C-alpha cells in the first residue's frame, strides 16, 4: 500500500474521481503551500512540491559576448548568424522541445484557449504560420532526438543554445554528466512551466506519518533545499519574492487535446517534409 504519492497535475482528476486521496487542507503548512498550479485547483487534496520551468540552456563559453536572444526576432537573428547552433528536440520525446514548438505556433498565430477539451479546427489552421517558421529555418536549425540529446550536444559544443528543463540541466550537472559551465534562462517571449503535486492515499496505513512527511515536504526550508540541489522551482508562498530569476510561469503548457494535436501536426508538417 502507498502512503504519500507524487502525481502530475493531469493525473489529479483521475485520482480524485476514484476517491483515492485523503484531504490535506488542514496541514499546518497548507496556508503557505501552493495548491493551484497549471490552472488546476487541487481542492484540498494535494499540494505542489516540485516546480519546473522550461527555457533555454546555453554555453557561455561559446556565446562569448553575444547577447542572449530574448525575443523571437532576436532568436531569428541568432539562428541566421549561427546556422545549426540552435537545436530543439522532437516533441514526442521530451517536453522542452514541445514547449518551444508551442511558443512558436502560438506567437506566430493567434491566442486561443489551449486548455479546451476539444480541438477547434480554426485554431489548428492558424498553426500554419508556425509550421512555415520551421520550414523556413529547416536548414539552419538542428532537431535532436530528445531533451537529453540536446543537452549532450550543447555540452559537446555542437550546439550553443537549446530549449531545456531547468531541473533536467541542473540534475545532469550534479551527477557530472554535463559541464557545470552551462547556464539557463527564460527568454522574454516566455516558455511554459509546471510542476508536480503530492498527496496522501485515502487508504494509507500510516496516515499520521504521511501527514508529518507531507507537511515537512512543503516547508520553506525543504523547498529551498530542493531548489538548491535539484534546480526545482520552490513551491512555497514565503519564497516567492526571491524568485526573480525564475518567475512564476505566466505561459502554460497546452492541455491534453491541443498537445496531442500539436504532436500529430508536427510530424506531418515538419518531420515528414
What residues fall within each predicted segment?
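Loop/turn elements at helix/coil->beta-strand transitions in domains of secreted/extracellular proteins
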Residues: 1-3, 82-86, 139-140, 157-160, ...
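Extracytoplasmic ligand-binding site segments that recognize negatively charged/polar headgroups
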Residues: 2-142, 148-149
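A ligand-binding cleft/hinge motif common to bilobed small-molecule-binding domains
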Residues: 12-14, 161-179
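Hydrophobic residues within well-ordered alpha-helices
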Residues: 15, 153-155, 200
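Alpha-helical segments flanking ligand/cofactor-binding loops in enzyme cores
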Residues: 151-152, 211
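Conserved C-terminal helix/tail region of periplasmic/extracytoplasmic solute-binding proteins
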Residues: 252-273
Amino acid at each position: 500500500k502507498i502512503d504519500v504519492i507524487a502525481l502530475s497535475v493531469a493525473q489529479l482528476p483521475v485520482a480524485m474521481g476514484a476517491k483515492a486521496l485523503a484531504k490535506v487542507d488542514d496541514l499546518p503548512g497548507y496556508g503557505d503551500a501552493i495548491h493551484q498550479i497549471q490552472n488546476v485547483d487541487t481542492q484540498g487534496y494535494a499540494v505542489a512540491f516540485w516546480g519546473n520551468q522550461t527555457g533555454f540552456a546555453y554555453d557561455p563559453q561559446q556565446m562569448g559576448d553575444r547577447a542572449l536572444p530574448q525575443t523571437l526576432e532576436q532568436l531569428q537573428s541568432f539562428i541566421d548568424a549561427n546556422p545549426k547552433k540552435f537545436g530543439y528536440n522532437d516533441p514526442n520525446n521530451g517536453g522542452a522541445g514541445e514547449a518551444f514548438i508551442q511558443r512558436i505556433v502560438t506567437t506566430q498565430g493567434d491566442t486561443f484557449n489551449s486548455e479546451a477539451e476539444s480541438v477547434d479546427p480554426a485554431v489548428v489552421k492558424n498553426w500554419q504560420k508556425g509550421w512555415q517558421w520551421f520550414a523556413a529555418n529547416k536548414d539552419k536549425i538542428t532537431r535532436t532526438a530528445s531533451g537529453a540529446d540536446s543537452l549532450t550536444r550543447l555540452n559537446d559544443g555542437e550546439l550553443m543554445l537549446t530549449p531545456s528543463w531547468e531541473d533536467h540541466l541542473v540534475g545532469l550537472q550534479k551527477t557530472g554528466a554535463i559541464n557545470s559551465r552551462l547556464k539557463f534562462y527564460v527568454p522574454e517571449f516566455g516558455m511554459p512551466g509546471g510542476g508536480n503535486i503530492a498527496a496522501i492515499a485515502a487508504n494509507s496505513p500510516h496516515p499520521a506519518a504521511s501527514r508529518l512527511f507531507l507537511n515537512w515536504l512543503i516547508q520553506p526550508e525543504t523547498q529551498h533545499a530542493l531548489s538548491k540541489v535539484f534546480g526545482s522551482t520552490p513551491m512555497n508562498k514565503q519564497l516567492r519574492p526571491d524568485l526573480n530569476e525564475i518567475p512564476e510561469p505566466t505561459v502554460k503548457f497546452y492541455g491534453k487535446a491541443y498537445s496531442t494535436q500539436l504532436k500529430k501536426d508536427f510530424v506531418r508538417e515538419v518531420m515528414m517534409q
